[in-house]
Amino acid sequence: MIQHPRIGIRPTIDGRRQGVRESLEVQTMNMAKSVADLISSTLKYPDGEPVECVISPSTIGRVPEAAASHELFKKSNVCATITVTPCWCYGSETMDMSPDIPHAIWGFNGTERPGAVYLAAVLASHAQKGIPAFGIYGRDVQEANDTDIPEDVKEKLLRYARAALATGLMRDTAYLSMGSVSMGIGGSIVNPDFFQEYLGMRNESVDMTEFTRRMDRGIYDPEEFERAMVWVKEHIKEGVDRNREDLILSKEEKEKQWEFVIKMFMIGRDLMVGNPRLAELGFEEEAVGHHALVAGFQGQRQWTDHFPNGDFMETFLNTQFDWNGIRKPFVFATENDSLNGVSMLFNYLLTNTPQIFADVRTYWSPEAVERVTGYTLEGRAAAGFLHLINSGSCTLDGTGQATRDGKPVMKPFWELDESEVQAMLENTDFPPANREYFRGGGFSTRFLTKGDMPVTMVRLNLLKGVGPVLQIAEGYTLELPEDVHHTLDNRTDPGWPTTWFAPRLTGKGAFKSVYDVMNNWGANHGAITYGHIGADLITLASMLRIPVNMHNVPEEDIFRPKNWSLFGTEDLESADYRACQLLGPLHK
């Protein structure tokens, strides 16, 4: 059984015996316990289990104790460390020198003992040795006997822990390509060096004929298939067929296509994570799967010109339920766009919520909207907006039909209930695919995302000579008047899922206007997640040594390793590029 990655907590202490160390033992160890309690009581793994922490076997005052802690952490699948102390300690003697995992240090802000002095000293050692570390120092002085963690310290500890866990969850997993390059899209030219060196992941690949092989040879669970057919007939609404009359399939042909796309979903899932039921059926090799944390399906054009498209498969893999009930989502990229798949993966591991995959399709200016519809935009839409629409698939959680405190949300599967599942299904239909584009047919996913949800749009790009760079745009979904929505939506493909998105503008750089956001977006796709998580993404990117070339996160929320400031404090974007370039990928 694979262990969850854990956070290692290291209580460091002044090594002087005969009074000094002894007086600090309880306070120091209590700091470690309080950090572990905070993390375990607040954060969860993608499967819903509380995040686990491992505390060093003793306080760390000298090198042998640092070594003992290191040995314990190696055996315990620790993916990141947090060092805590209320006092002076011996910097380079007590630090963790593992170069391939993230590190953070919380130095207690008190007057009785110089915790801040140790923090500064050990961070200097980290910078000198080229091992980045995040510095955490509370804004306000605390009393020596104060066991509470200040709110500003909590925020940084949790931001660090979320991002660090994401690095651990990715490590030693795989990206599975189902097919190859789709329509010349750069993101589907999968770069194994990027996955290996930046994420610690491997790449696997299967030809799309693996789907037909498994269908023809019955390499799927026939009982599940029968159950799925019943569920689909009961719960899935087939949408309006907008095809030309000569391209409309018969009822019998559509019935066969439903059978086909259900099998595609089952096979796509089994390829990613395996299925013990296949071993019972005599298919031991296929039962293992590919240990894929994220995958992508090429589809266009070779598959979709001949077979039903992957929209149903992609939709339900990215959704948090199917005929087997509510479950955690998979991360699955349309058109095998591995870079958007990784963008979705970053979002997912930071939030435990499903992801919207979308084309960044159109910028609608206020003037263009008024010309086309006669409507004057107002509120969050006043400066214009982006039309996010994928070519036929999207997580049903993207409908926004789940709620929290009466507001639309996308939330982890363990918070989802059956009434929300039904609401998603009721607000979605599945029209036959546009056969001018998808000659083999299939069924698209059609819905409208509810407005007023805080969301973050993300994209990872590869730049020759630099490597990966990340783009982040926080903003809100919009709910347009119904007639305005229909007028605009009908100008594209009304059989596809639509999200209207207004990025938050800052008045400068790429966020001077909504047009500038569109104009500076690095690719045709984006990954959209619930919540404003730009600050968490910036922290994660710094751990992986991926510079951020565009974001609208307030400067006070940016949290990177302390040695980033040694690359410059005025132009943070340039400092980020220099730090990432000098340090190189996390796993190289």
Swiss-Prot record:
Q: Which SUPFAM superfamilies match?
A: FucI/AraA C-terminal domain-like (SSF50443), FucI/AraA N-terminal and middle domains (SSF53743)
Subcellular location, in the record's words?
Answer: Cytoplasm
Can you supply a Gene Ontology BP term from the record? L-fucose catabolic process
Chief location of this protein within or outside the cell: cytoplasm
State the reactions this protein catalyses: L-fucose = L-fuculose
* MF terms in GO: arabinose isomerase activity; L-fucose isomerase activity; manganese ion binding
Q: Which cofactor does it need?
A: Mn(2+)
One Pfam family recorded for the sequence: Fucose_iso_C
Q: What is its EC number?
A: 5.3.1.25
What does UniProt give as GO cellular component?
cytoplasm
Which pathway, metabolic or otherwise, does it act in?
A: Carbohydrate degradation; L-fucose degradation; L-lactaldehyde and glycerone phosphate from L-fucose: step 1/3
Active site location:
E335, D359
What are the entry keywords?
A: Carbohydrate metabolism, Cytoplasm, Fucose metabolism, Isomerase, Manganese, Metal-binding
Gene3D superfamilies xref list: 3.40.50.1070, L-fucose Isomerase, Chain A, domain 2, L-fucose/L-arabinose isomerase, C-terminal
| InterPro entries membership | Fuc/Ara_isomerase_C, Fuc_iso_dom3_sf, Fuc_isomerase_C, Fucose_iso_dom1_sf, Fucose_iso_N1, Fucose_isomerase, Fucose_isomerase_dom2_sf, Fucose_isomerase_N/cen_sf
Residues annotated as binding Mn(2+) are E335, D359, H525
Protein's UniProt keywords contain Iron-sulfur: no
**Main function:** Converts the aldose L-fucose into the corresponding ketose L-fuculose.
UniProt family annotation: Belongs to the L-fucose isomerase family.
Spell out the PANTHER family in the cross-references. Answer: L-FUCOSE ISOMERASE
The name this protein carries in UniProt is L-fucose isomerase
Species of provenance: Streptococcus pneumoniae (strain CGSP14)
